[in-house]
Amino acid sequence: MKASIRNKLERLRERHEEISALLAEPDTASDQKRFAALSREYAQLEPVIAELNHYQETEQALASAREMARDDDLEIREMAEEEISQAQARLEALEAELQVLLLPPDPNDGRNLYLEIRAGTGGDEAALFAGDLLRMYARYAERHGWRLEEISASEGEQGGYKEVITRISGEGAWSRLKFESGAHRVQRVPETESQGRIHTSACTVAVLPEPDAVEDITINPAELRVDTFRASGAGGQHVNKTDSAIRITHLPTGVVVECQSERSQHKNRAQALALLQARLKNAQQAEQSAQQTEQRRQLVGSGDRSERIRTYNFPQGRITDHRINLTLYRLEEILQGDLDQLVEPLRTEHQADQLAALAGD
């Protein structure tokens, strides 16, 4: 094992012991926010320390076997050689596992998210494709046991959506869907096309992590303009009787959010504020990372909305993810929600890139 990696592991062990002591202090237990943060960090370190313990136990077993290999007894030496071989193989496997555990965690991996789909070039056909994408993500969410809630929607004239915003909640939602941000291109023959010509349209997808209730983005109520209006769409007669829908404008930035998914104006306001907070935090993070352009253009892409990440070719039943040059002729399966055929290779590529960076430290 490289000395730099061993040093990192020892520092993590020291931190693990430090947190253990802090959690036992009465002052920590009385501070709920600090206690929760330390508990999360402790839980993240637990698998690393457990694996490190296994690694060091195996190192000790290897040292003992090498000592035995110097014995005068031939039978003992042969047994020791076999133990040496097994211990070395275990050490290699454990080191690989430790390197994966050392990869920096995405601070948003435990969060829920907002998924925004907007029709781009292509008019009605782009709006229809936005509807296809929403159904794909809804089926994918169902496969993983996540909950998908519609926050706001603007329907297309011929179906689909000009824009649709949803909230997806559930374990692992962000870690799997975070690679979906970008431009999604579709190539197919529209139903209205009499000549059979293939048209190209596009939609943009933005995936934003939902901030915690105690997030560090502070919104000044004086900087908000709140408008109410009557909700449109499904919902029975109720939507025509009360101004339950909410539109909030953040005056300093011009960011506008709407929510009309709930019958309660209070609930719609809370949802809209949460979405506004997510957008403002995303903008803040983008500004902070503007100087790290090269890092943001790793193999899985930067996630910029303008970046074309994927092409859906209906005549050929083909889907191509341009970030990792992966082409699959399983378009229908993926549109039915089997998105892991793309997500897993993206996650693997991202992890490989992180491991390469770790090895270069």
From Swiss-Prot:
Q: Which InterPro entries match?
A: PCRF (IPR005139), Pep_chain_release_fac_I (IPR000352), Pep_chain_release_fac_I_sf (IPR045853), Prokaryotic/Mito_RF (IPR050057), RF-1 (IPR004373)
Residue list for modification N5-methylglutamine: Q237
Region (Disordered) location: 285-306
Q: Which organism is it from?
A: Alkalilimnicola ehrlichii (strain ATCC BAA-1101 / DSM 17681 / MLHE-1)
According to the UniProt record, one GO cellular component term is:
cytoplasm
Q: Name one GO molecular function term.
A: translation release factor activity, codon specific
Q: Name one Pfam family in it.
A: RF-1
Q: Where in the cell is it found?
A: Cytoplasm
Similarity comment: family membership: Belongs to the prokaryotic/mitochondrial release factor family.
Q: What is this protein called?
A: Peptide chain release factor 1
Q: What does this protein do?
A: Peptide chain release factor 1 directs the termination of translation in response to the peptide chain termination codons UAG and UAA.
Give the PANTHER family listed for this entry: LD18447P
Coarse class of the primary localization is: cytoplasm
* Assigned keywords, A-Z: Cytoplasm, Methylation, Protein biosynthesis
How is this chain modified after translation? Methylated by PrmC. Methylation increases the termination efficiency of RF1.
Would you say which domain of life the source belongs to? Answer: Bacteria
